A protein has these predicted regions:
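SDR active-site lid
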Residues: 455-526
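Substrate-binding pocket helix/loop in short-chain dehydrogenase/reductase
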Residues: 13, 377-378, 385-387
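Conserved HGGG/HGGXW glycine-rich cap/lid loop of the alpha/beta-hydrolase fold
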Residues: 1-36
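Conserved glycine-rich cofactor-binding loop
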Residues: 287, 294-295
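Residue(s) in the substrate-gating loop at a strand-loop-helix junction
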Residues: 422
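Active-site helix of classical SDR
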Residues: 401, 438
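Flexible "cap/lid" subdomain of the alpha/beta-hydrolase fold that forms the substrate-access gate
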Residues: 27, 34-71, 77-231
Length: 553
């Protein structure tokens, strides 16, 4: 059952309906006052009670013996909340997928809670929604909205949507009438619901799809509905308000997942992560794929993101290390999978991305962290050494960033990619020719990707830690040295890093902060901050420092 919003009619579902009709009997109707339905005069004829009677009449006629799966948008979604919380309809709605239309009673309680216990954050969210709802005040003015529709807006509506919403629609013969008559929906229901809200609890499974670029409905309105919805899923899509028109296939796919689950199939991994509970952690419902997760920064990032609510795919070239990380997460109550991959191998990375997409529904966060250390000058670094470090430090990041970014764009749900660079990206060094080169490449790649993917709702961060105690020094290759010399240099470097005391847990927390605040470049440690400062404002000093050998060989 498809219920349209304002100022639309059932034609808004012309892209969605055929996709669902492959497997289901699809019903779409014009609500009263829209399309070919009757338009009774008087505001009292547009109350929720009358709209509910209409809905019952439709399902009595077309699905009298079987509950319907409800999908609604905008004002159709607002009134459908009435249906899914109405005692008369208990058992007649099998599931409800809502898009861009909250329950007005829930909004009333939401506003009360923020006024009674105000905080800067809660008041900011409430004021943000009030600004988005400017048109509601306009619709309560006498005559003005009706005149606007009759004089110009009815004819101009397709052009207005194209300019303001970047959404193309086909002009409709009933557009002016739909706009004029539908104003009564606001006048008959808004004030009563917001100022004297009822306690409305859903009696069917509910999935709320949130277009993150919606100019009219804030994502904050759907953040905490577990009080009202015992079975609740929440999913975000990087899209504007008119999702049935612009992202019909994605909307149909998400609705289908809930329908299939309501009909008895197990939850898909993506749907399972979207299930909401009372105590919601910041990354609840997100899937994070982390390379180099078997030790050091990668393992700490996996544990930190899991602690914040994310499900984890721990990726490492060593199977036992990846499994150890996954096991640690499971022991703390998290969800994790282990995967063995050589990140520099394109085919293996493609297989990983394909598996994540098909089995888990796609990644929300990707941490391209796998890397190796290498010290030595350009003269001592052989072609084989270059091939090895480029394979992991550069190609590993390129494969992970490119392939997962492509998946994120196709999903349309945004995401975040973190690429682990280093303080060495800012500081030329005679002792770190190959390593610093690869990390500078990662930094520039991250900056380029950030510019490219911003419009898709995908953030990209370059993580640049200083001398973190990760164990990388114990495996660093010192070019141009004997095995005995390498052992001495590794032991010396490891001791220095331990004395520095920058823990990988600190880097992991900085990674989480980068995701939360969409930071472009994250420097961790005084040496990272100072190297970045010098590279910007004292390049002569940076070049002078580059001449100093710190390797002692």
């Amino acid at each position: 059952m498809l219920v349209h919003g304002y100022p639309d009619n059932s034609e808004v579902w012309h892209e969605v309906a055929p996709l669902l009709a492959r497997d289901y009997y699809v019903i779409a109707y014009d609500v009263r006052g829209a399309g070919r339905s009757s338009s009774p005069k008087g505001m009292r004829n547009y109350t929720f009670a009358r709209l509910t009677d209409d809905f019952i009449a439709v399902i009595d006629a077309l699905s009298p013996g079987k509950p319907v799966h409800l999908i609604a948008h905008d004002w159709g979604s607002i009134q459908s909340w009435e249906f899914v919380t109405e005692a008369r309809l208990r058992g007649r709605i099998a599931s409800y997928t809502s898009c861009s239309g909250p329950c007005l009673d829930h909004v009333g309680h939401w506003m009360r809670a923020r006024l009674l216990r105000p905080t800067p954050s809660s008041l900011g969210k409430m004021l943000g929604q009030l600004v988005r709802s400017w048109y509601v005040l306009l619709f309560h003015l006498p005559i003005v909205p009706e005149l606007s529709w009759r004089l110009w807006l009815g004819r101009a509506w397709p052009r207005v949507l194209r300019r303001v919403e970047k959404t193309a629609i086909v002009p409709r013969a009933t557009q002016t009438a739909d706009g004029v008559r539908g104003v009564s929906l606001y006048r008959a229901n808004f004030i009563r619901s917001l100022f004297t809200p009822r306690k409305r609890v859903a009696h069917a499974p509910v999935q709320v799809i949130v277009p993150t670029l919606d100019k009219y409905v804030s994502p904050a309105l759907s953040e905490d509905l577990s009080r009202w919805v015992p079975q609740y899923w929440r999913r975000e899509v990087v899209a504007r308000h008119w999702l049935p028109v612009t992202h019909a296939a994605r909307l149909a796919e998400m609705a289908r997942e809930l329908i299939e689950h309501a009909e008895g199939k197990p939850e898909s991994e993506a749907l399972q992560r979207a299930r909401q509970h009372g105590d919601r952690k910041p990354l609840c419902g997100k899937l994070a794929v982390i390379t180099g997760a078997g030790s050091g920064i990668g393992r700490c990032a996996a544990l930190e993101f899991a602690e914040q609510g994310a499900a984890i795919v721990a990726v490492d070239i060593r199977a036992e290390d990846a499994e150890r990380t996954a096991k640690l997460i499971r022991l703390t109550g998290g969800k994790a999978w282990a995967h063995t991959v050589d990140v520099g191998n394109a085919e293996q990375m493609e297989a990983l991305v394909d598996w994540v997409g098909k089995e888990l529904g796609g990644a929300d966060i990707v941490v391209n962290n796998a890397g190796i250390g290498m010290a030595g000058g350009i003269v001592d670094t052989s072609e084989r050494d270059w091939q090895r470090i480029l394979h992991v430090n550069v190609w590993g990041v390129i494969h992970g960033a490119r392939l997962f970014a492509k998946q994120m764009v196709a999903r349309g749900q945004g995401g975040h990619i973190l690429n682990t660079a280093s303080a060495a990206a800012f500081a030329p060094s005679r002792d770190l020719a190959a390593y610093a080169t690869t990390k500078a490449a990662v930094l520039m790649l991250s900056e380029c990707m950030r510019g490219e993917l911003a419009g898709q709702g995908i953030g990209v961060s370059a993580i640049c830690p200083g001398f973190a105690e990760t164990g990388i020094m114990a495996s660093t290759v010192y070019t141009g040295t004997t095995e005995a010399q390498q052992a001495q240099l590794r032991a010396r470097a490891t001791k220095l890093y331990q004395l520095r005391g920058l823990k990988p847990e600190t880097v992991a927390k900085a990674m989480f902060s980068a995701v939360q605040h969409n930071k472009p470049v994250v420097t961790i440690g005084i040496e990272a901050h100072s190297s970045r400062f010098i590279s910007r404002y004292a390049q002569w000093l940076s070049r002078l420092i580059a001449r100093v050998s710190m390797a002692g060989h």
